[in-house]
Amino acid sequence: FDTPLQWPMLTHWLHNMDQDNALSMLCSLDFVNNKQDKVKIIFVPCYLNGNDGIFNIPYYDLILGNDLCVYPSYYEPWGYTPLEAVAFSIPCITTDLAGFGIWAQHVLAYEKAENSLENGVKVVHRTDYNYHEVADEIRDAVANYALLTKTQVAKAREKARNLSKKALWKKFIAYYEDAYDMALRKAEERTK
């Protein structure tokens, strides 16, 4: 094919393309996948279930092909995607607006480990008002990760996997059982 697509970074037409925030931002930043561009964007706005028409590979198989995952969440009560990444030994960047990011910060602080991709996860502070700082911090983290040696990357991947093991359900269930017990006791007190 020698005729470029109208939107060369987009794999699927969107219902309201002119109102899509991600596509609008890509266009405003002139990410159009020119030959000379060092960064190429593949925007796949669909559920990766193995029948998306582009990859045709289930999400969990596709994630294994990543060197690094970036999930700059604005809000997620827990945020499974960063946890899924580290469970597959893929270091990731997330934010402190995702429950996983908050939890990972606490784990890193408890272990007196630096908040960096070399430790498997980088948690970026995000608010309503620091968009550019978040973008800069993510850019710097990705650039620094690209400079790591193969040995350092292997260690980061191992640390990512080890972090995920601390988030196994068998480790968290006790907290849910305690909360459930507390709720039952309080409900019982109210009915007396």
Protein language model annotation of sequence segments:
Residues 1-61, 123:
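Nucleotide-activated donor-binding/catalytic signature segment of Leloir-type glycosyltransferases, i.e.
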Residues 46, 165, 181:
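Residue-level marker of positions within ordered structural domains that often coincide
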Residues 55, 65, 69, 156-157, ...:
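Conserved, well-structured beta-alpha core segment at the onset of a catalytic domain
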Residues 57, 64, 135-140, 170-174:
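A structural signal for well-ordered alpha-helical segments within the folded catalytic domains
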Residues 60-77:
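Acidic donor-binding loop of glycosyltransferase active sites
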Residues 72-164:
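Catalytic binding pocket for nucleotide-activated donors in carbohydrate/polymer assembly enzymes
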Residues 169-192:
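C-terminal alpha-helical cap of glycosyltransferases
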